Design a protein with these regions (language model features):
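Membrane-interface transmembrane-helix boundary segments in multi-pass integral membrane proteins
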Residues: 169-211
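Alpha-helical transmembrane segments in multipass membrane proteins, preferentially the mid-helix core
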Residues: 129-146
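N-terminal membrane topogenic signal
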Residues: 2-19
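Juxtamembrane "helix-exit" motif on the non-cytosolic side of transmembrane helices
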Residues: 31-40, 104-113, 170
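Charged, low-complexity interaction regions
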Residues: 245-255, 268-275
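Alpha-helical transmembrane segments of multi-pass membrane proteins
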Residues: 21-35
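Non-cytosolic membrane-interface motifs at loop->transmembrane helix junctions
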Residues: 42-50, 112-123, 148-149
Length: 291
């Protein structure tokens, strides 16, 4: 059961990562090749001023790094990501979720739903954020996230908000800064978005943490239930035999790990004898060896 669950998570993570990378690339290329848009100022190379683009780029880099681990997981029948990559993905998923919520609840009422969620914005405002949220919350779940990692995930948003405030409010467009393309300092006092941004972002991070950790705990409970079962014993013996058969050489001896098999039997609720388990191992080995 656990191997099937791990494989399912691995496949969905691979598909999600490929789609996010492809959609982000498509959206950014569309912005770069659109030199003029009457509804949006920042096209061409200026598209990299926008949080939408930078947040999607951040999560796409993280998802791109996931791909080699998923391929390795399918090959070795074990999918696992390092802790640093989970934290990186948390930061990226937090950023694009903020992008989605701002697009849906702030930009759409002012500019229209169709305008905000069509063209390149269909990929950058909707597809990538939603898929990243689902993948991180329910399928990339082999690490328990603590609150210190949630604080680290706020860094990209904090850096961008600080830069936006500097370029828009302190410097201003007349002196070479940015125009207020998000309207955050135009419709309300500039300090309000700055003060509200981090608490809202932290709430998003905690929501992602909640779903991710719930998936992690559910998987761990399943592992504990399976760990002492008859099926666990069989799967371990079969896996070990197949791995050793893959490394078999024409003139090498067949070695049955009897002590390890005995240890497995003693620590499960199986009623198999050591002899029966060794025979199972030998049969699996012979069925999978090339020689």
């Amino acid at each position: 059961m656990l191997e099937k669950q791990n494989r399912k998570e691995c496949i969905f993570s691979l598909v999600s990562a490929l789609i996010v990378v492809l959609c982000t690339s498509t959206g950014i290329v569309m912005n770069l090749t659109t030199l003029y848009d009457e509804n949006f100022d920042h096209m061409g190379i200026q598209t990299f001023c926008m949080f939408t683009v930078l947040s999607n780029l951040l999560v796409a880099v993280g998802m791109g790094l996931v791909i080699p681990y998923t391929i390795d997981g399918l090959r070795k029948h074990y999918f696992h990501l390092p802790n640093w990559l989970i934290t990186f993905l948390l930061a990226g998923s937090t950023s694009v979720t903020l992008t989605f919520l701002v697009s849906l609840f702030i930009l759409s009422p002012f500019k229209g739903f169709v305008l905000i969620f069509t063209g390149s914005r269909f990929f950058l405002h909707a597809i990538c954020p939603i898929l990243s949220f689902i993948a991180f919350s329910f399928f990339i779940s082999d690490h328990y996230i603590n609150y210190s990692e949630c604080l680290l995930a706020l860094l990209p948003v904090f850096i961008y908000v600080s830069l936006y405030y500097l370029m828009v409010v302190l410097i201003g467009e007349e002196k070479g800064g940015w125009n207020d393309f998000y309207g955050l300092a135009t419709y309300v006092p500039a300090w309000i978005p700055v003060v509200l941004n981090l608490p809202v972002t932290f709430g998003i991070t905690c929501l992602l943490r909640y779903f991710h950790n719930r998936s992690f705990l559910r998987l761990r409970e399943a592992t504990v239930r399976d760990e002492y079962s008859e099926d666990y014993l069989k799967s371990e013996i079969i896996y070990l035999a197949r791995q050793n058969a893959a490394d078999d050489q024409p003139h090498s001896d067949i070695v049955i790990p009897r002590r390890f098999i005995k240890f497995l039997i003693e620590n499960t609720d199986s009623d198999k004898t050591v002899r029966d388990a060794c025979i199972m191992y030998l049969n699996q080995f012979l069925d999978n060896t090339k020689y």
